[in-house]
């Protein structure tokens, strides 16, 4: 089975969140984990298959940055962040299933791999744009998650439509198929609508 013991998940997840946050420059300041595993005297085992960890940070945002703008003809759809790898494929689907229900290889491939240094670089781009005040070119920004560019870039264009030049996406793995470039959830990447 590819299920880790509850205690190992709680310790490693907590260590990972703290390590990532510290490398990124925004330490995790709150959080908790939750699991349950009980073996009854009869030998029957009761427990939660998926352990849960919640973490959080504290931030602020100016009111004018709360509303995202609408796509209009002539705007650019761009991405900033890490290069494309074949990781996080089917991550959205895998997160909706019971852990261990899939094949081990599918479970492994669906897991994203964080890159705190790249996350910090991407965050600096966003922050630099925000600090331009009224000259901020960002109309809308979406974090790339489940579905990869296939999801985030379509969300940005929505009703206005747009042209996506898939072959201009920077690749970390030059052997990726067009399908994997389009759907993989490679990490630390955002899509931007630039006006």
Q: Over which residues does each language-model region extend?
A:
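Glycine/proline-enriched, intrinsically flexible loops and inter-domain linkers
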Residues: 1-195
